[in-house]
């Protein structure tokens, strides 16, 4: 549910990493039963991913909210699935970042967007934005806490102006890490976030599978200085 959308391969990887399921055959059998009983929905969206894509269904939401006490803030019928796949590819990209950090064994905690939205609805100390995630990593003998934003497509200048205004009002976090989906998006983020009055770091999402999180190259949007993630102040 907290992934919003997830490919069948991503779902298997999440389940295997958490130790909930070690047999792929058993896993597919369980997924098929959940689908047959209306707890999840399966979608084919080749414009977003070649794999089938799953989302929580209304029956699954009711069970998790009423029987498990899982916080939820979204459509009662579950996530909207548009035929053009809008929003799906972004969610799948966030999943890949999450999986990369899980595999690195540096991930201490991951607060997802749904949990953040629920917190922002009721908490006295709210985040300035509904981030994609709030992440804690164990790097170089210390724990690094930051908001994570995955930027897959460019936004209009007015939208970046609005985001800058929100980030500069953030009082509960010291750092925001933007991971760009492409080098072009990374360059655009450097331009749009330059001299922001908040510690915003910009990196490339595709670097994560190739390097340890500690060695991820990031740029400080205030100063344009380049750091390894482990070395940021």
What do the predicted segments below correspond to?
Residues 8, 141, 154-165, 169-233:
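Non-catalytic C-terminal interaction segments of nucleic acid-processing enzymes
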Residues 15, 31, 35, 97-105, ...:
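Hydrophobic, Leu/Ile/Phe/Ala-enriched alpha-helical segments that form helix-helix packing faces
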């Amino acid at each position: 549910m907290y992934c919003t959308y997830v490919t069948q391969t991503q779902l298997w990887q999440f389940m295997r990493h958490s130790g909930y399921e070690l047999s792929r055959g058993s896993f597919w059998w369980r997924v098929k039963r959940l689908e047959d009983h209306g707890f999840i929905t399966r979608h084919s969206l080749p414009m977003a991913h070649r794999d089938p894509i799953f989302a929580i269904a209304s029956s699954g939401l009711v069970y998790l909210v009423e029987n498990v006490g899982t916080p939820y803030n979204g459509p009662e019928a579950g996530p909207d699935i548009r035929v053009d796949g809008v929003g799906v590819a972004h969610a799948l990209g966030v999943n890949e970042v999450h999986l990369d950090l899980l595999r690195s064994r540096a991930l201490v905690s991951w607060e997802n967007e749904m949990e953040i939205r629920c917190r922002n609805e009721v908490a006295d100390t709210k985040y300035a934005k509904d981030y994609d995630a709030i992440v804690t990593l164990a790097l170089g003998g210390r724990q690094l806490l930051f908001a994570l934003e995955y930027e897959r497509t460019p936004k209009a200048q007015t939208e970046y102006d609005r985001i800058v205004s929100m980030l500069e009002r953030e009082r509960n976090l010291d750092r925001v890490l933007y991971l760009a989906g492409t080098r072009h998006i990374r360059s655009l983020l450097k331009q749009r976030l330059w001299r922001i009055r908040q510690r915003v770091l910009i990196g490339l999402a595709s670097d994560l599978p190739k390097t340890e999180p500690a060695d991820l190259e990031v740029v400080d949007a205030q100063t344009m200085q380049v750091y390894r993630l482990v070395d940021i102040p």
